[in-house]
Structures are given as C-alpha cells and as structure tokens.
Amino acid sequence: SFIQFDSGQYLVDQGAMTKLYDFEFSMIGDPLVDIATMGMRNSYEPLGAPLPELVRYYEEATGEPVNHDAVVFHVLQFSLLGTMQFTGTVGKPCPGDPHSVYLMFDLALRRSILLALSHLTGDALPELRPLEQRTGDNAPLLAKLVDTLGTLPVTGEAAETHKAQVAELIEWVQRADDHGADMVARNIADVSALLGRGFERWIDAAEALEAYILKAGPEEDAALIAVLATIEGRRLQLFGPTALGEAARHVVLPATRFD
C-alpha cells in the first residue's frame, strides 16, 4: 500500500478536511504504519473522532481486523527512526538548526520508544523517586540572561518566534543546571552496577553500555530495558516540566480499540 509514513497531518476548514501535507517520507509499506503515526499525533493534535472509531471504519472498509500489537510495533519503529534522525544534531548542533524543536522531538520520541517497548515485552517501566527541589549554581547568571532576553526589543513575528525559542533553550539549561549533575551521577552508578566496573565520565559509561548491549543476548533484554528506561525516565523528570517537554509529557500509546 502507499503510505504517508508521517501521517495525521491535515488541513481543515470549517470542520472539513481540505488537504493532506508533509509527504516527503511517503513510500510503499504496511498501512498500519499510518494508523500508528496518526495515533501518535493524536495525543497532542486530536484527529476529531476517537481513534478506535476510525480504526473500526478502517476494518469495515478493508474487511480485515487490525493487528493492534503491530500498530504498537510501528510506533516503536517510527519513534526509533525519528530519534536516530535527530540524535546527531541534538548531540552536536549544526548552525541554523531549529534547536528547540529538535530537543522537543528527541524527548518525546524517546518516551514513545519506552512505552512501546514496555507494551510489547511486558516489562513494566521502573518507578522513579521524584526530583528533590534544588537551585543550580548558575541560577543568578541564568536569571540575568532571562531578564536581558525579556527586555530585548524585537520586531515582527519571525523575530518574536526566534526570541521565544531562545527562552525555551534557557529554561532547558536552567533545569540542567538544577539537576543535571545529580542525574548524570545516578546514571553512571546504574551503568556501573550493571557492568561491574566504575566510570568517571558519563560518555565512557554510555559507550561501555552500548558495547555491552550489542553483545547481549535476549535473556538480558529485561535488565537492559530497565536500565535504559531509568536513564530516559530521569531525563523526562529533568526536562519534562519545561515548555519543550510538554509534548513528551502527553505521549501515550495509540488507543486503537475501545476498552
């Protein structure tokens, strides 16, 4: 079937859909991909009718039942592909990139990966203790930066949007200043416990964890999912409360059938 792949993007006028757009990823593939990506988008851009109702219409039109676990698999696949697509510029930003947008996508897609993995494997995501309230050492300097940006005169919608993106990045940095060092220390401790050796720097721990995962057998999946979910869960705790984290806070698996 011809699929849009990044589906669910419609132009609507007075309650009627007028156009589809964003077809650069379109291809021949499994039509359940479009149901999966429509469902992902539905969490923050509602489609209108409940998704289970739309799925029922699809089943009536095709005469075939939808494989609901296959939909979740495609959620996992799309989320993983998207994360890999942005990981380069998130880790090493390119001049002129929409940095705040990519951070938002990265955080939300990683959350989607974890939810899909948990559903498909049956491994529950770990419960994390709440972050303690604290203020980072650079709080006064960052407050000055926020104040300076707020008084910066700008003219035009494009300039206002750019200014808002800078404010979002500053808020992200503030959260990293408040809790980032503690998060890294906890992540290093978890990886050290799993691998049985200590690390001084997170980059060394992350590289060792990646090498371990590449060699691990399926019997270690549950333990690895728990570690990765803990690491990414802490990241969501850290940046979820920001403006850029709003999409990640609303990520849920597509509900493709009525309970």
Give the role of each language-model region.
Residues S1-V33:
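Active-site acidic catalytic loop and adjacent metal/ATP-binding pocket
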Residues G15-T18, P126-P130, V173:
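Conserved NTP-binding catalytic cores of kinases and kinase-like/nucleotidyltransferase enzymes
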Residues S26, E45, A70, H74, ...:
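Short, solvent-exposed segments of well-ordered alpha helices
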Residues L32-V66, L76-P98, M104-H119:
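Active-site activation/catalytic loop segments of kinase-like enzymes and analogous catalytic loops
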Residues V72-Q77, L107-E127, G196-P218:
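Charged/polar, low-hydrophobicity segments characteristic of intrinsically disordered regions
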Residues D97-Y102, P126-L131, P153-V154:
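Short beta-alpha connecting loops at secondary-structure transitions
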Residues H119-K144:
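Charged, amphipathic alpha-helical linkers/stalks
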Residues G136-E168, R175-D259:
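C-terminal amphipathic alpha-helical interaction region
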